C-alpha cells in the first residue's frame, strides 16, 4: 500500500519518516520470504492507521520538532511493527531500529566533549531551549534543573507520549528497546547518562548527564534490569 493511501488525519498526525520505513522494511526482509514481505508491511501500515485513529490529536503534527525522525510517530510505527512481527523480531533488533534513526545525528557531534565546561554549558542551553518547545505543545512535559558548574546536568520528563501510547495499547514490554538509545547517544558526546526510572514504569523519566570522566559515573554503576532497561544504581 502506498503511504499516500493511508487513511490518517494529516491535519493533526504525521506519517512515519522515510528512514523509519526503511529500517522496518529491512527487518521484515530479514525475517520473511520475498512473497510475504509486502503483506507483512501492509499489516504494519494498517495497524499504524488503526491505532492513530484511536490516539490523541494534539501533538502538533509537522510543526512539532518531536515528530521528526526517531520521534513520537516513528516510535509508534516501530511499536506497530513489533505488534505484527513480535514472533520473529528480537529485542536487540528493535534497539537497532531506534539506534539507526537517532545515532547518526550524534555521530556528527563526536567532537563534543561534555567533560569540558564549554560543551557542558552548551548542552544545558540546548536542553533549556527544548523545554521551551515542550511548553508550547505540552506533549513531553519537561523540567530542566538550573545549571550548576560542579554538578551534572539534570532534567526530567513527567509526560511522554511514546510511553503513554505503549501503556495504552499494550507495548510497554518493548519500550526498553526504544529508551535505551538515550544512553548510546550520550556516549557519543563523551558523556554518560544516569537514569533510575522511566515514564513507562514510574512517574517520570530522569536524565542525569555528566562527562564520562566524572566520578559521579563510578558512584552510579549501570546495569540492565529484568525488563531490558539500561539503568543506574
Region locations from a protein language model:
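N-terminal, charged low-complexity regulatory/assembly segments
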Residues: 1-82
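A short, structure-level motif marking secondary-structure boundaries and short turns
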Residues: 65-67, 166-169, 224-225
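Amphipathic interaction/junction segments at domain boundaries or subunit interfaces
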Residues: 70-168
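Short, hydrophobic/π-rich interface segment
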Residues: 141-201
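Short, charged/polar, Gly/Pro-enriched secondary-structure boundary elements
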Residues: 162-164, 212-219
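Short, cationic low-complexity segments
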Residues: 184, 222-233
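C-terminal edge-of-domain segments
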Residues: 196, 202-212
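N-terminal functional module detector in eukaryotic proteins
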Residues: 206-208, 219, 225
Amino acid at each position: 500500500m502506498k503511504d499516500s493511501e493511508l487513511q490518517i488525519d494529516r491535519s493533526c498526525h504525521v506519517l512515519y519518516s522515510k528512514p523509519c520505513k526503511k529500517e522496518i522494511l529491512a527487518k521484515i526482509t530479514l525475517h520473511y520470504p520475498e512473497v510475504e514481505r509486502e503483506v507483512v508491511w501492509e499489516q504494519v501500515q494498517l495497524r499504524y492507521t488503526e491505532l492513530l485513529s484511536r490516539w490523541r490529536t494534539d501533538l502538533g503534527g509537522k510543526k512539532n520538532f518531536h515528530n521528526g525522525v526517531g520521534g513520537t510517530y516513528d516510535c509508534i510505527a516501530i511499536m506497530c511493527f513489533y505488534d505484527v512481527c513480535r514472533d520473529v523480531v528480537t529485542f536487540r533488533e528493535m534497539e537497532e531500529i531506534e539506534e539507526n534513526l537517532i545515532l547518526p545525528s550524534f555521530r556528527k557531534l563526536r567532537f563534543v566533549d561534555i567533560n569540558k565546561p564549554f560543551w557542558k554549558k552548551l548542552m544545558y542551553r540546548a536542553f533549556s531551549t527544548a523545554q521551551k518547545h515542550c511548553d508550547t505543545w505540552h506533549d513531553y512535559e519537561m523540567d530542566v534543573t538550573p545549571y550548576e558548574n560542579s554538578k551534572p546536568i539534570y532534567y526530567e520528563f513527567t509526560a511522554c507520549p511514546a510511553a503513554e501510547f505503549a501503556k495504552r495499547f499494550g507495548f510497554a514490554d518493548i519500550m526498553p528497546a526504544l529508551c535505551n538509545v538515550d544512553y548510546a547517544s550520550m556516549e557519543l558526546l563523551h558523556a554518560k547518562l544516569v537514569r533510575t526510572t522511566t515514564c513507562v514504569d514510574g512517574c517520570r523519566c530522569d536524565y542525569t548527564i555528566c562527562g564520562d570522566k566524572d566520578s559521579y559515573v563510578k558512584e552510579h554503576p549501570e546495569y540492565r534490569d529484568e525488563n531490558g532497561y539500561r539503568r543506574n544504581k
